[in-house]
């Protein structure tokens, strides 16, 4: 149809679907979630941005939860006490808050949107205020600059609401409504961000009006952008929070949402957010830490300050398998609350108990962290990483090894990275490794060893077969991995073990090699690795083809050689 001279296209789905603002009758349960319109949260390419994005999501969820509680609604999930909303927001309360909220009763989508926008406004205005105070001479109050920030303040998020007389129906209603998105993406003139390429580069004159008298001058724009980011980098580094790696490299050119993700982790900006959020509340703060504050990342540089020696680090990204499906299977509110509490308790315990590095965020079913030696001059060994991965699975399963403590299985990507691998590449490798672990059947770990030249070797295995690396024994009864690594290379060179592109595939030699080195103290034939692998090949390798079985064995040896070798 045509309205006011403009064509309006309406799909069949939109005709049949109730608008987001229209509430469902006889609603006993409400489910709320939200998403950024441009995906700027999940497209983080720096560790600091990833942390900032995680905290933004958690903080906005907390605002919605508190809004529901303030109106007398019972929040079923996430599990949160009344005091957690009465008290000031802090890292301990907010971190790991999921952005899917289940509420008992008919909670308005408009109220959820208002609560989210209140929290987002606090974040945006804190960033604007800091820029205005620290870059006064750059005229950051330019009308175009203000216009751009206002657009992102209004159009950054979309809220989805589902309702039903049962929890399962409310969840289904939410998924249906998510199919129809009604967001508006802010438009812009000029060049796009150097990180994502999706949005305009943020700088004071980014949205100046182009007229006949005020023609666009690309050379002048570039000079203004360079000047802005040089000044911004200097202001961030000169604010009594010395940090490595630096908050901002002057060569980076960020969009407004990318800049917000970076700024919220700065101690001055996080304090401003805290102040704006609580300026009208009489609260005893105590010793709680502001929501977005984080210590510096200097220990993640992978280089010893004194000796200049470099070292490898482990990066892990884990996620519970089919959590949404598990939630739908829980029909009683108390079961959902119990599951939510278990996830949050696990994430809190995991974060506080991790001694081999730092957990950047832990939301219960999803977490991300970095493994490194906390003692100067002592390098973290790859074998230590394997031991930790084995123990992680045990911790996730809980005391009863025959069932999952949390009701869901775990998929994880682990990256062992050389010191010269750029941080953005490491994060991408983590995402790919986790995705691969899920795609091959879930309940798996993918270990990827990334070298400084960008090449890598990897191995994906169900968790319980990770311990096979510990069963290695060389021809002399030791643990020298060069024996099996050398034999593998020799057999491949002679085509005794075919390449993955060979027409004829026979796994017999590869299985014999597995038995030769990984059957220490095994007497029963049924317990031989070759027989276990052959009998359970589809489950273990994700395929019944010989070439995939050969590749699985080869990958295990390559990864074991890199992480467990004593030479």
Across the structure, where does each feature detected by a protein language model lie?
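Regulatory and interdomain segments flanking nucleotide-handling catalytic cores
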Residues: 1-567
């Amino acid at each position: 149809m045509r309205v006011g001279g403009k064509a309006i296209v309406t799909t069949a789905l939109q005709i049949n679907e109730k608008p987001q603002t229209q509430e469902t009758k006889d609603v006993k349960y409400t489910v709320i979630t939200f998403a950024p319109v441009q995906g700027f949260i999940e497209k983080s390419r720096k560790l600091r941005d990833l942390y900032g994005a995680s905290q933004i999501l958690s903080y906005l969820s907390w605002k919605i939860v508190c809004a529901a509680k303030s109106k007398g609604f019972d929040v079923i999930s996430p599990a949160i006490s009344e005091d957690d909303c009465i008290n000031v927001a802090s890292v301990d309360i907010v971190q790991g808050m999921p952005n899917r909220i289940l509420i008992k009763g008919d909670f308005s989508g408009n109220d959820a949107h208002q609560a989210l926008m209140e929290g987002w406004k606090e974040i945006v205005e804190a960033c604007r205020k800091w820029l205005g105070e620290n870059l006064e001479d750059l005229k950051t109050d330019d009308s175009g600059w203000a216009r751009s920030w206002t657009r992102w303040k209004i159009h950054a998020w979309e809220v989805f609401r589902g309702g039903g007389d049962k929890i399962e129906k409310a969840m289904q209603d939410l998924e249906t409504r998510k199919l129809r998105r009604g967001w508006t993406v802010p438009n812009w003139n000029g060049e796009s961000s150097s990180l994502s390429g999706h949005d305009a580069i943020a700088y004071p004159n980014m949205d100046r009006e182009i007229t006949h008298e005020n023609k666009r001058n690309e050379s002048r724009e570039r000079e203004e952008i360079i000047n802005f980011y040089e000044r911004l980098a200097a202001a961030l580094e000169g604010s009594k929070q010395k940090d490595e790696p630096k908050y901002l490299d002057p060569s980076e050119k960020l969009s407004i949402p990318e800049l917000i993700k970076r700024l919220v982790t700065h101690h001055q900006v996080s304090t401003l957010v805290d102040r704006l959020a609580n300026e009208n509340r009489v609260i005893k703060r105590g010793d709680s830490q502001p929501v977005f504050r984080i210590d510096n990342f200097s220990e993640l540089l992978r280089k010893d300050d004194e000796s200049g020696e470099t070292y490898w680090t482990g990066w892990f990204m884990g996620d519970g398998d089919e959590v949404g499906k598990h939630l739908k299977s829980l029909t009683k509110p108390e079961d959902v609350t119990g599951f939510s509490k278990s996830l949050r308790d696990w994430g809190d315990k995991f974060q506080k108990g991790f001694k081999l590095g730092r957990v950047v965020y832990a939301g219960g079913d999803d977490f991300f962290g970095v493994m490194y030696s906390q003692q100067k001059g002592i390098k973290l060994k790859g074998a230590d990483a394997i031991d930790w991965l084995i123990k992680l699975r045990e911790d996730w399963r809980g005391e009863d090894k025959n069932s999952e403590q949390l009701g869901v299985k775990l998929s994880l990507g682990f990256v062992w990275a050389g010191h010269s691998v750029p941080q953005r590449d490491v994060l991408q490798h983590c995402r790919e490794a986790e995705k691969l672990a899920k795609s091959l059947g879930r309940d798996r770990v993918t270990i990827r060893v990334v070298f400084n030249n960008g090449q890598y070797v990897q191995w994906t295995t169900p968790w319980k077969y990770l311990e096979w690396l510990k069963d290695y024994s060389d021809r002399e009864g030791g643990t020298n991995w060069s024996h099996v690594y050398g034999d593998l290379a020799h057999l491949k060179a002679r085509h005794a073990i075919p390449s993955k592109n060979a027409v004829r595939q026979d796994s017999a030699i590869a299985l014999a090699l597995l038995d030769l080195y990984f059957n220490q103290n095994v007497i029963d034939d049924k317990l031989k690795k070759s027989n276990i692998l052959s009998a359970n090949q589809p489950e273990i390798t994700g395929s019944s083809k010989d070439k995939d079985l050969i590749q699985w064995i080869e990958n295990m040896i390559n990864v074991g050689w890199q992480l467990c070798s004593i030479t």
